[in-house]
Amino acid sequence: MNPLILFLAGGYSFWVGLMLISALLIPTSQRPSSLILKSLALFAGLILIAVSMTPIAIWWYAGLLVASIYWLIAYRTKQPLAERQSLARRGIAVCLLSALVLEWPYAVLPKVPVPEHRTLVILADSLTAGLEENDFTWPERLAERVDSPIEDLSHVGAVVKDGLTMIENVDLDGKLVLIELGGNDLLGSTPADEFHRNLNELLQRLTAADCAVVMFELPLPPFRYDIAYAQRSLCNRYDVSLIPKQYLLRAIAGEGKTVDSLHLSEQGHVQLADFMESFLQPAFSR
């Protein structure tokens, strides 16, 4: 996978942007060269954060923009006041700290919910199903390692709406459901409101069946805040454990892990099976 795509889709640009903006907190002289460097760091940081479209609260983006403008005013006036500069730095610091509080929980691996019945149901697209009939997929590899039934309902080309079809006539009561859907919605033309509606209905049905639900967070291209926000808000509403997108990207990124930059090779299936075995172990080891 292209390193730039990985950097953006994995949300790494958000954290690098925060690091660049944190340079504004370092007290420096009023020399023009120092102010120019800090201004460049500010603009670069804002651009990286903007293209990441991290689904953090809108008020945070607004607050960061206001704090950044105030910093520029406080430091670019001919006779800057120490009080203004101090207030500008405090405003930037509040934005950075609140970003850590709001976003860090989505960057760490959640605890897997323990289902009533030790059965894993997988709703997924071709990333899981594979492109060829003879592909030895990660669910098949996982099934050989754990002493629990695995029902792999994945199929090529599936979108979130297809998840509703997958679970028809399937006994879901009290089972653990893993969702790896949405990538084809992003690559296709599914509007954000339709994505929200379909995912809402899918999660509603799963929680009504008393399922424990886990979902892969979608690695997003720039400027898809709407899809990212819809996924996070619905997962919060239905108490769905969201696996940070970095973990899925680790199975995709790297030489030899995919056959076409999107679909897993044998090596990619092995790595994802290794991760899922470790992650799901608490649900299977009662």
Predicted feature descriptions by range:
Residues 5-53, 62, 84-90, 144-145, ...:
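Alpha-helical cap/lid subdomain in secreted, periplasmic
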Residues 20-22, 46-48, 64-73, 95-103:
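Hydrophobic core of alpha-helical transmembrane segments in multi-pass integral membrane proteins
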Residues 54-56, 78-79:
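N-terminal accessory regions of nucleic-acid-interacting proteins
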Residues 59-66, 122, 159:
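Short N-terminal helix-initiation segments at or just after the protein's N-terminus
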Residues 61-95:
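Cytosolic-side transmembrane helix boundary signature
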Residues 72, 108-110, 201-202:
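Short, charged beta->alpha transition segments
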Residues 100-158, 162, 166-173:
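Serine-esterase "nucleophile elbow" of acetyl-processing enzymes
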